[in-house]
Amino acid sequence: MNIIDKGLSFGPMNMNNHPAMLIVHHLEAEGPQWTVEAIHHMHQTEPQFMFAGIGYHYYIRLDGSVYKGRPDNAIGAHCQGCNTNTLGIAFEGNYDNRTEMPDAQFNAWCELKSYLYNKYGNMPVYGHREKGSSECPGANFPLEKVRNANVSPSRVIGWNKDNTGWWYCTDVVNNYFYKDSWELIDGVWYSFDKDGYAR
């Protein structure tokens, strides 16, 4: 998964976010000028926002490129009353006017959703309007298609998480992982049960 990190600089934020829900938004705008840096600047400087920086955690462009917004462990600024323990995902486009989501954008969402599910476990997906006083993500946003997008399981060398717990993969190709043992990882001892989950 290629997530482009532009190294945005933020003001003070509450770093106690524990992602358990995804909330999707439309930007209500599109075009080359709507970069992640432009949104970040707008959220920091325009009077109706005045946030520490971009309120979203991820931004998906129409061309399928995915940009990092605020850190996952930072409480968002994207859905009043529902910013804690959520991740805000913004889609470029005005889905009140735009009638179809480009394949590139939808496919990027599927990749991002898979990445986040593999990192945090299964999380419900909501449109902004379902959790806040808003019409976002727009009348024509394919919310059910986005909500029900298939997730591809993936593994990485190192720590992985699924619905049962955390486990440590040592070989992705052969699916080797620690189990029924104590292991020293990054200077810390961890105990793994017979199924490979950290205790």
Where are these regions (language model features)?
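Short secondary-structure junctions
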Residues: M1-K6, P47-F49, K161
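Basic/polar, cationic surfaces and motifs that engage anionic cell-wall
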Residues: M1-L27, L62-V66, P71-D72, C82-L87, ...
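Active-site acidic/histidine clusters and adjacent loop/turn architecture
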Residues: N16-Q44
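Glycine-/small-residue-enriched capping loops at alpha/beta junctions
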Residues: P47-I54, L62-D63
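Short loop/turn microsegments at loop-to-beta-strand junctions
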Residues: I54-G55, G187
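Glycine-rich phosphate/pyrophosphate-binding beta-alpha loops
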Residues: I75-A77
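Extracellular adhesion/carbohydrate-binding repeat motifs centered on closely spaced tryptophans
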Residues: P153-R199
